[in-house]
């Protein structure tokens, strides 16, 4: 088929036989058969068939029919048939339908008139339309609004044709007159849109003359008015912008939520005045609370986030209104609300925000909400962020959050214990109460990771005599009686805490597999140490207070090593604060008994798997230390660990501060840019809003708010040459990548002395790319150029390729000439941007994502840090590993990189490299993602770039 088909429908019968049957049915008198025949004819035409002999039959036997269904199908048939010949001239037989269309325009039935007028909106042949214009104009005064509505649409369509102003020269005057007297909402909208498109001055005059009554207009007309205001105010330095802003503010009280939403967006685009921005923000907040559709809430939150980036000072005042959207049951909405609120925190509103979040935490505790565990985790993270930025609010929430250390949602419990660890270091005033609360609630903790962190806190921050003694006592209570098992006379191993209950069957078998540590390296540990859920043990083996014992009996020797280290620290601390050496020796003996019992359990056949070497060495070190303590070792154990943690927090705060400074120092305007001083302007007759708007415009000009950076000199560095200089047609393109589409601006130059006819840029794609526009033919004069724009839709981050040809004809050559274009490769770097996430989130995603691309390191670079910097620059990713962890020369480096795509996809990269004896680097770069495309594309990019190429 030569022409592109809009619809493909399979027919079992041949088209020739089908055409004969259609013709026979149309010539008959059976109305039902005619309807069926017309439907089949329309399907065949849409399927690419021509049916050239059918037109006369339709004119003779279908045009006179009075049946409404047949008339509707007839108009559809007339719309899709070819009305022009190969040379582009109108077919003479089209005149045959003019009389029928004129009769329909005077038909007594309103439906026939209306559908005929609607059909004329889709005609573009002046030969057919010209004799019908008087009849169309007569329908402007018809009593029925259905006919007037479509008559206005028909006039608008005709006037927009290339020579439409000659067919209906007085159309704007007629439509304006009709608009003044029209009462139907749809008809008024059609008339107003016609004026907006074809006679904008008349539309503006009508809008301004009815400015006081715009709020009473129907919502369809109000939407059209908002669109007109947007279009009119795009021109710079409009003196009457204040009048349009008043209209927009009046429309904010419209009962239509669609109008209100559009008005809020228009108001922000028209004015930077605080009053206008505040009105828009309040409108968005009202929509956020009144709309039940989650998609609407997400869209409104996006608009509020855009306001935050440019008008943060105004948005701070509506933070509590935004928080009310947490009432939505949707977690995505809650997450966006919390992210937005955290960016709007100030010393003035942080207490109110934390109080609200505290109430939400209590709701999750009461079980009132769905997915309360996930929601509680989000709330804990939000409160953590508030307390880090404003430490004075930590005291009001930390004790409430510590009740969730034993939460069944392990992720939420981990967030709580990390929050406690940071607050107890940064807020020394809360240390005493937090240690006491942790000791009181320690028995509730069921997750191994939470226990490990809580034990570290007890070991580092229990300073007074009572705190140290209580901490040791609590740990021993949670461990139960030692040794952990006894061997009976029959040789059967039993739990010493449950002498009558055999527990061999109650032990959870722990599988061993590699896990990802915080620095991105791999390590082997038992699955029980991950504590994804509460350990599964037999009934009777898990007591409410023996949480540590249960975890150790499940094979968690990593936790056992942490317990040993904590007891060692507490005994060393007790030596400093306890004057009685008898008590010190008693505590030391108890700690040694616990450690030796753990070693005995780990080396016995009681558990399916023995203790791992790392844990064994760690516990043995603790035993030796308690038996022979030196001052240097004591200093390392009691001071260095806490100092390292404090240093880590300080570095984290420093990095965040430096990032904020870097963002604040970006220059948006040049020193010699023009600034207008509003004090020198006349203020006579200006409202308060107009005065504010003038001030804000001047400030934006001074700070670069109006600067456009999308089109600059850097575009010249990205021009792609598509053909050679010796080709008769030279072509080059600039590729602009937007979020979901690619725009190709192609410049074509005719380098010959001949006119190129039917020149067509034919493009094709490979990958997840799709052409939006159909190719068009152009005529190119000798040595002239043509700009052609092609739009390509993108659906994923997979690497795509655009290829094609330029086809043209000349008068000297009968055949078409073809110039093959160079391929255009779409770079994944255009779709991903650096992002940041917590270490816990990174590890969870790493474990969850199934697609991994493993790239071997092959580079001429010999410095580990230099190679890492090169990969970061080449992949446009963010390094999550702190700089302090990368300092020094140890011959080994491990780092995590992270980025997000415009489609919301996560890209995770782990680099593990070491320096060989010959100075070369070896190792692997692992890429993980949820989809295959981004993993493969990023791997190809790294393979190409890692050798140090550009």
From Swiss-Prot:
UniProt key word Transmembrane: no
Keywords carried by this UniProt record: Cytoplasm, Cytoplasmic vesicle, ER-Golgi transport, Golgi apparatus, Membrane, Protein transport, Repeat, Transport
Subcellular location per the Swiss-Prot or TrEMBL entry: Cytoplasm; Golgi apparatus membrane; Cytoplasmic vesicle, COPI-coated vesicle membrane
GO BP annotations, alphabetical order: endoplasmic reticulum to Golgi vesicle-mediated transport; intra-Golgi vesicle-mediated transport; intracellular protein transport
Protein's UniProt keywords contain Membrane: yes
Membrane disposition: Peripheral membrane protein
GO molecular function: structural molecule activity
Main location (coarse class): cytoplasm
GO cellular component: a single term: COPI vesicle coat
Residue windows of the HEAT repeats: 92-126, 127-164, 275-312, 313-350, 392-429
Quaternary organization: Oligomeric complex that consists of at least the alpha, beta, beta', gamma, delta, epsilon and zeta subunits.
Function: The coatomer is a cytosolic protein complex that binds to dilysine motifs and reversibly associates with Golgi non-clathrin-coated vesicles, which further mediate biosynthetic protein transport from the ER, via the Golgi up to the trans Golgi network. Coatomer complex is required for budding from Golgi membranes, and is essential for the retrograde Golgi-to-ER transport of dilysine-tagged proteins.
Name of the protein in question: Coatomer subunit beta-2
Source species of the chain: Oryza sativa subsp. japonica (Rice)
